[in-house]
Amino acid sequence: MSLPRRALIAVTSAHAELFEGGGHTTGVFIGEALHPYNVFKAAGFEVDIASEEGTWTEDWLSLQPGFLSPEEREQYDDRSSEFRREMDANVKAADVLNKDVSVQRLHGIDFPHADRD
């Protein structure tokens, strides 16, 4: 039996302040979802994107110059691109639990002051 050509990219539903008092939000670091998405698609995989709540927000810092190439930024900004349609159709992780996947990629959020006990 061969493995399914399906990948799951799990992103965060977090929407929090990036820097204390900075006014910018954290969430999905776009390159961390876009880069593997492009690799999986180029390898012929179907790709699902899911999050805890079926929602997402972009990390402000991830859209600043230097984090995405001009081509990647164009792909992200184009709401009709496959990547952006998949991001915007983001479903709850619980809704994809029964799908057979051969690759999983998780992108979370780090809270530096979180209680780690």
Residue ranges, per PLM feature:
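Extended, subdomain-level signal for the structured scaffold at the beginning of enzyme domains
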Residues: 1-117
